[in-house]
Regions:
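Bacterial N-terminal signal peptides
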Residues: 11-20
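Secondary-structure capping and domain/repeat boundary segments
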Residues: 24-73, 77-194, 298
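Membrane-embedded segments
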Residues: 327-412
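Structural signature of tandem-repeat unit edges
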Residues: 8, 201-206, 217-234, 244-257, ...
């Protein structure tokens, strides 16, 4: 019977084509179509139950466990896939949707080649006895995103504040999850800060959590503990730190809410928070006129990796690497991403490097320009081509930050710490909006790169961005002159009052000119 079936296979296949049948198996009254799916074995991973038999058209799920330092890239399955990575960094849940044929699926995995060694430096390894943990990275960005750390090390009575290239903290510092320049033999040491004594806090227990109602200490530096009296600290109530003389405050992981006026009229100069903080507003820091620096440590998986917002930090990496070289920096919103041909500029001006810093026009330009200016020097050129339908943002009139500001900082929060908060408004309100926006978003990882996707989030075979930061995927001409978002576009003088837009733009440009940086101003590039 088996031999007969083999001989008749070609004939049966022809009959199926004629009949217009499809599927995995021959359907009859006794048996439904079945598909046999096998995940092939390979280096760097193990699949639990790799062979499955399912009904045609249904989904099938697998659990893939990665070896140390290996990364899951995807599969060669041509249908829709759903990939979920667990927090341990090794477990991958893979779902193949609507499987219609029997086939063998190849897993694409890659071993990282950029090693960073993390030293507990007084802490304890959560998953082993060694004081050091080695992690290898793929190097999908010019600089490497460091570990978020809290999944590696712990230390009773201390908060992990960041990493440093020296154990005593005198080397180069980098925040948890933020980027650092890689070099052979790189070791990053955990930096710990002791919790401020419990006696300095007045708190009450609410629904199993500690709520801080007052601070009665006099320290210049306060590290608010993750727990008090054995209860996790969740909330800091209004007026709790009002009028204090402290200059530095660290809000440990697990604190989810800071109420209005919590630090009112304090002498606070710098604040450390973690990106599990959900609710905080500028009212919490009313009359804190000396608050200048906000450090954000990442302990949550990123949501905007691979998004166009994520390109800001990739472009910023390039800008940092060219800090000491002559360069032309292009700036505006997405029109700059789409519209410039930086390779032509590079060819026309061989003495200059070219960096395309355009990302998104509908977010305030001021903080972006300030970060750009910090990487430029005398003789460099800024070519600004603002988009007029976002004039209040593009001409630096709007000082209020928004969720998109933080979306651009997500893959390197350290960049935000270089901004002077006193130059902006609604900083913490914007951070809360950002947290709300990404609350229900799919979480990814820092290895995901925007150049692997097009503008709509579809995977591409060739990089969608070139080395300069230009978006290079073909874009057809517009079919309409109607502006997006319904915003008016007015190119007349009356639309740009001098005391608002023009003076604001000139004030920012003057900072560049004072550093010997040439500033050129033009219309934004556009297609037909």
């Amino acid at each position: 019977m088996r031999k007969r079936k083999l001989k008749m296979a070609s004939g049966i296949f022809l009959l199926l084509l004629i009949a217009g049948l499809s599927g995995c198996g021959q359907k009859n009254t006794e048996k439904e179509n079945l598909c046999h799916i096998v995940l092939e074995a390979g280096e760097g991973y193990h699949v639990t139950d790799p062979a499955r038999t399912i009904k045609s058209g249904s989904d099938v799920s697998f659990t893939v466990t990665l070896d140390d330092n290996w990364q899951f890239l995807g599969t060669n399955y041509h249908g829709e896939t759903e990939i979920t990575k667990e927090d341990d960094g090794k477990t991958v849940n893979l779902v193949l949707h609507e499987v219609n044929y029997s086939e063998s699926i190849c897993i694409q995995a890659e071993k990282g080649k950029y090693e960073i060694v993390y030293d507990a430096n007084g802490g304890q390894n959560i998953s082993g006895d060694s004081d050091r943990v080695s992690i290898c990275y793929r190097g999908t960005h010019q600089r490497i995103n460091t570990s978020t750390g809290t999944d590696l090390f712990a230390r009773d009575g201390y908060t992990l504040l960041g990493w440093n290239t020296r154990a005593d903290g005198t080397g180069q510092a980098v925040g948890l999850g933020s980027r650092t320049e890689w070099k052979e033999g790189l070791v990053l040491y955990a930096q710990w800060i002791p919790w401020t004594g419990e006696a300095d806090f007045v708190y009450k227990k609410v629904s199993g959590f500690a709520v801080i109602t007052s601070y009665i200490g006099k320290a210049q530096q306060i590290c608010v503990p993750s727990s008090l009296g054995g209860f996790p600290v969740r909330t800091i109530r209004e007026q709790a730190f009002a009028d204090t003389e402290c200059k530095t405050v660290i809000l440990s992981p697990g604190i989810h809410e800071v109420e209005k006026w919590a630090f009112r009229n304090s002498r606070l100069e710098q604040l450390y928070i973690y990106d599990d903080l959900e609710k905080i507003s500028d009212y919490a820091f009313q009359d804190c006129d000396m608050l200048r620096t906000l450090h954000i440590n990442s302990i949550e998986a990123p949501a905007y990796s691979g998004d166009y917002f994520d390109t800001f930090q990739d472009k910023y990496d390039r800008l940092l690497s060219l800090k000491d070289k002559k360069k032309i920096v292009l700036f505006s919103g997405s029109s700059t991403r789409f519209g410039y041909d930086s390779a032509m500029l590079d060819q026309a001006f061989p003495d200059y490097e070219v960096v395309n810093m355009g990302v998104f026009a509908y977010s305030p330009a001021l903080p972006q320009l300030e970060l750009i200016r910090s990487c430029m020097k005398e003789g460099d050129i800024l070519l600004d081509s603002p988009e007029f339908d976002a004039a209040n943002r593009q001409f630096c009139y709007q000082k209020e930050l928004d969720y998109a500001t933080f979306a651009m900082m997500e893959s390197n929060y350290d960049a935000f710490a270089d901004l002077d908060l006193r130059e902006y408004a609604q900083v913490f309100t914007a951070f809360s909006a950002y947290q709300t926006a990404r609350q229900d978003m799919e979480r990814k990882n820092y290895d995901v790169c925007a150049s692997d996707y097009d503008e709509d989030g579809n995977e591409v075979e060739e990089p969608s961005y070139n080395e300069y930061g230009d978006y290079v995927v073909y874009r057809p001409n517009s079919t309409s002159e109607k502006p997006i978002y319904g915003l008016p576009v007015n190119y007349t003088v009356n639309a740009f009052p001098k005391e608002t837009y023009i003076d604001s733009a000139n004030a920012e440009f003057q900072k560049f000119l004072d550093q010997g940086i040439k500033v050129y101003f033009t219309y934004s590039p556009r297609n037909k």
